[in-house]
Amino acid sequence: MSEEDIPIIPSRPKKRATDSSLSSYTPNASADNLISPSPPIIPTSRPLSRAKTTDNINTDPVTTTGIATKEEVELPKVPTNRPTRRTTTQELNDLIDNTNHELEEIEAMVFKDDPNKMSTGTNDDDIPHVPGNRPKITSKTTTTITKESLNDSDAAINNKNPSDEQTDSKVRPEVFKENLNEAKIAKTYDIMDMNNDIKEFVDNGNKTLSENEDTVSTEHLDKVTTSDASRVDEPPDTTLMKEPNTILDSEEVLASNDGQVSINEKEITPTIPNRPSRKKEEQSESTSNVESTPVIPVRPAKVKEIQSESSTRLESSSSDEQEKANMVDSVSAVAERSTNSKDQIYTNSERASKESLSEAKEPEIEKNDNQVHIETKHIPVIPERPKKNGPPPIPKKPSSRIAAFQKMIQEQQAQSFNSLASDVPTSERTISEIEKDGDKLKTEQTMEEKNQINRSNAERTKFASSLNGLFALPGMAPLQNLPAALTKKLSQPSESGFNDSKEVNGGENISNIRQKRARGPRGRKLPSKVAAVEKVNDSNNSNEIEVFRAWRIDSKPVTPSEEIVITQNQLSDKQSVISSEDIITESETDKQITSSTEEFHKYTEQETDITDRNQDVTAEVLEHDIEVQIEKEMEEQILAEDEPYEEVFSAETIG
């Protein structure tokens, strides 16, 4: 390849300060023609942000990049002296000092008739204060006047010009005087309206109380006073009559404490009628309902008198409640306008009225209770006859299996009970009796085992016979009898044959039976390196330690006869001397040691035989050959048994 064909790899582009250098770059340019740009200038100090409203943002070349020096930034100037604080109440205090004389002249003009009620005047140094209790009733005209005047004064203070300082000092006192005069007059008229309203409510209360006094019945008052006259010292009417005077006194005291003056002039105001109470309607409805309810008399002579007395009492109590409700309603309007002293008086009046009502109702309730007791005494109550209990349910008869199971349990319980009774101390029973009991138990157990075996065999034969004809066997043909060979096999075995086989099997020894070895994976042997390892036998003349079993415990089931023998041996041993039991002769110990060593050697010889057999291949080959021979013999037997079936099928096919 020539040098012209080799592509030129351009260098990595570098960042430039402006866009002008980017426009001059062309991709086809060679690496030699590229010029490295100059590095940017890094400022030594952090730039300070300038205000956006400055005029030199576009003119200075340095500001275009957003960098400014410390010399161009102008710092704010800190004043040397702290500004003086001006108070807003100084001018008002000056105006108040100049208006005290004018206020005294206004009071003299207003209170010509009663010079004693004039205010004593204020000192020059005192500042007017706001009253503690705000007047509740205020007229719309006075509030609007005071608001407009105060707004005018505020506007005059705010609209201040430096050129009008001399004129402003003259105008302000005049405006402030007018506002104070108007406010003072409005307060005096408000106090007059409050006093007039209170007097009107008091007059209305006196009228309603006087009317109620005429309606109260003398009979009811006599009954109430005779019951508990010591509780009430004065009637409720007198307490209610004293309320208006106490209300007026308290209001006059409040007015004097606030520094305000009350006027005794009266204004005529229309009377406000009382709202009709709902209690009257409810009480009238309740009385009508009580009168309409019929009462069934037991004795006609006595019950009529009781009914007449109760009806009169109910009517009198309803009228009393109506009158007292009217009195409470008339006083409630006055009590709402009063102060804390009025509330206390009202609560006292309510307590007195409730006590009087409770005293009036107590004798009525007692008499009504007596009337109910009289009626209940004369009504006979017949108790209900107790219901007879039905006959007990008849228990269901248990099924045959349950009955047999219950009998079996009862028999077992009886046997256990008899065995417990037979367990008497040996001193009372003889050894011959105990042996007889043991023989009886053995015979019973053997008989039960025989019966169970016979039952199981009989059930099996029945089950096999019931399956005849259901499943097709190899030698069976449809719609024909079974062959003779199958009938012999399927026939029920006789009891004699079963017993003979049992005797034969019982005579065989268990030791002659071949025990099968657990088969493992075939064809797998140990590796040659492991199998060829020679055992090392250390033949040292040093002493050797042998570990063997010194004693052994065998647990076997014990029959009752054996238990009796054991108990007798224990008793005989206890009677013997303790020393003779504990001492063991040397001959016995030697015999035990020799027997234990022989057992240990036998155990070790068996282990070595097993290991040698596993390592030898000849033993495995012999076992394999024996298994193959046994399988061949079994196949021959099966074929010999199937020959009669083949003859039958061949005869059928030929025929």
UniProtKB/Swiss-Prot annotation:
Keyword Protease: no
Biased composition (Low complexity): 79-89, 136-147, 308-319
Places the protein is found: Cytoplasm, Cytoskeleton, Actin patch
Region (Disordered): 1-99, 114-171, 209-400, 414-457, 490-537
Family matches, as Pfam families: Aim21
Keyword Cytoplasm applies: yes
Bias-annotated ranges (Polar residues): 19-33, 54-67, 337-350, 414-429, 490-499
Protein name per its UniProtKB record: Altered inheritance of mitochondria protein 21
Organism: Vanderwaltozyma polyspora (strain ATCC 22028 / DSM 70294 / BCRC 21397 / CBS 2163 / NBRC 10782 / NRRL Y-8283 / UCD 57-17)
Taxon lineage: Eukaryota, Fungi, Dikarya, Ascomycota, Saccharomycotina
